């Protein structure tokens, strides 16, 4: 779609991962999608080749998001404009938080709660949980995160609750909320 390529592209990503390399899309996201080590190497080489053919810098932060969709958009824009200056890759969680005044809303909160499917090495690369955690720390609020699984532990002082393994979402959230409330009441010196 050539007319679409002629616009200014603002890509909001949920990760700062580049397209390739040890912190790239294949290495960071492949394992959670079921890719083996061999698969990851093939995927990484494929993304590197795509970047080479498209003349796109694979080290650009955020290009690893959404399976490398930004690579194609950057290539199209470069073909039409001669450079990639019409593609702007921004941290999506931060942009959404800022546009909704989340920092101001968190500022008066004693406890801030968020969730994450899997809390792992990629959580800190721009995911919602990391942005909400930063805002909570800046506001001196207690921060809690509920996740389906924790591969890594959150920062010290964070209340971390693993969701129970059940298909009943209401039950998961009710139990997680209760655990967070108890942990907060047991550790907080200022309640209410």
Positions of PLM-derived features:
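N-terminal loops that bind phosphate or other acidic moieties
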Residues: 1-192
């Amino acid at each position: 779609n050539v007319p679409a390529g002629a616009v200014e592209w603002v890509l909001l990503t949920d990760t700062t991962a580049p397209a390739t390399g040890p912190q790239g899309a294949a290495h960071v996201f492949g394992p959670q999608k079921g890719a083996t080590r061999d698969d990851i190497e093939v995927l990484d080489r494929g993304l590197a080749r795509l970047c080479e053919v498209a003349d796109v810098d694979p080290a650009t932060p955020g290009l690893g998001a959404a399976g490398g969709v930004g690579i194609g958009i950057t290539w199209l824009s470069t073909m039409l404009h001669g450079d990639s200056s019409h593609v702007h890759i921004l941290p999506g969680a931060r942009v959404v938080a800022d546009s909704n005044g989340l920092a101001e809303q968190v500022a008066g909160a004693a406890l801030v709660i968020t969730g994450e499917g899997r809390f792992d090495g990629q959580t800190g690369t721009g995911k919602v949980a990391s942005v909400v955690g930063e805002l909570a720390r800046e506001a001196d609020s207690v921060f809690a995160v509920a996740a389906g699984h924790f591969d890594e532990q959150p920062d010290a002082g964070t209340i971390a609750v693993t969701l129970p393994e059940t298909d009943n979402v209401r039950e998961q959230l009710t139990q997680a909320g209760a655990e967070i409330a108890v942990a907060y009441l047991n550790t907080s010196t200022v309640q209410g």
